[in-house]
A protein has these predicted regions:
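Residue-level recognition of alpha-helix termini/interfacial anchor residues
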Residues: 40, 111, 115-116
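Catalytic core of nucleotide-sugar-dependent glycosyltransferases
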Residues: 71-80, 85-112, 126-156
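Membrane-interface aromatic/basic loop that binds lipid-linked glycans or pyrophosphate carriers
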Residues: 136-184
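Donor-binding/catalytic cores of nucleotide-activated saccharide
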Residues: 1-69, 74-89
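Short, charged, amphipathic alpha-helical segments
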Residues: 114-121, 144
């Protein structure tokens, strides 16, 4: 189901699904007005990977006017052996630091209460995506951090099943919890 409204411009309030899933959190396929970036002091995080997501999602929630372009303006190379996306084991926790910074930005702008459910659902989604795409032994290290503290810190653990948008993702989260209980 398409999340964007059939008219432009629009803003975050007119996106019909999780605002953090309506667009991918990379910046290279988006255009921004310089004045908007400067006015909102938008910056990339200084970390190896996931360094553009805070910029992108901050822009998304702060923008009063968003437009899309249907023309293909860029092509992306995939499966490049030494790319950052293929070597995330070296910076496996960067997504977590982005999620914490995003939550703080939302709070600083008085938006967290309005967007909290989308944020927590995205935090689960992005945590699981990172977990599912890492290799061992980093994958186990991430699972231990998620279950040991990060799911609590991100507000995921305190939520009932019906709070989550995606049943499959919630099921994977519960399976992860049950796996840990069974091992003890």
């Amino acid at each position: 189901e398409w999340a964007l409204p059939p008219y432009e411009p629009f803003n975050r309030r007119q996106i019909s699904t999780n605002i953090f899933r309506a667009f991918v959190g990379w910046a290279w396929d988006k255009l921004y007005l310089r004045e908007f970036v400067m006015k909102n002091d938008l910056k990339f995080q200084e970390q190896r990977t996931t360094n553009d997501a805070l910029f992108v999602f901050s822009a998304l929630v702060l923008a009063e006017r968003i437009c899309t372009v249907s023309e293909i303006l860029i092509h992306r190379r995939v499966d490049t052996r030494d790319s950052l996306s293929k070597t995330r084991e070296k910076s496996w926790d960067n997504f977590y630091h982005m999620l914490l910074a995003l939550r703080q930005m939302l709070k600083d702008h008085g938006l967290y209460t309005e967007i909290e459910k989308d944020y927590i659902n995205y935090a689960l989604h992005f945590s699981l995506w990172n977990y599912n795409t890492l290799a061992e032994p980093t994958k186990t290290k991430l699972r231990e951090k998620l279950l040991g503290e990060w799911y609590d810190e991100l507000g995921i653990s305190a939520r009932p099943e019906e709070y989550f948008y995606d049943e499959y993702e919630y099921g994977q989260y519960k399976d992860m919890l049950n796996f840990t209980v069974e091992k003890q």
